[in-house]
Amino acid sequence: QAVRYANGYTYDIETGQVSSPYTGRVYETKGKAPFYGFGFEHPYHYYPGYYHGYPHAFY
């Protein structure tokens, strides 16, 4: 089961992984939801151990 965000990234609920629609890269979120606050006013994604304020910026 996966959640697709408005920016196109998908979050797999069972594995806790986020995949990028642009690069195909998969990011491990260590069991935490990659986006926090669904209003996207102050969205944060969690990726390799860091909170980062840009939901579209997976490096």
Swiss-Prot record:
Xref: InterPro entries: Cuticle_2 (IPR012540)
Higher taxonomy: Eukaryota, Metazoa, Ecdysozoa, Arthropoda, Chelicerata
Keyword vocabulary terms for this entry: Cuticle, Pyrrolidone carboxylic acid
Source organism of the structure: Limulus polyphemus (Atlantic horseshoe crab)
Residues bearing the modification Pyrrolidone carboxylic acid: Q1
Entry protein name: Cuticle protein 7 isoform a
Molecular function in Gene Ontology: structural constituent of cuticle
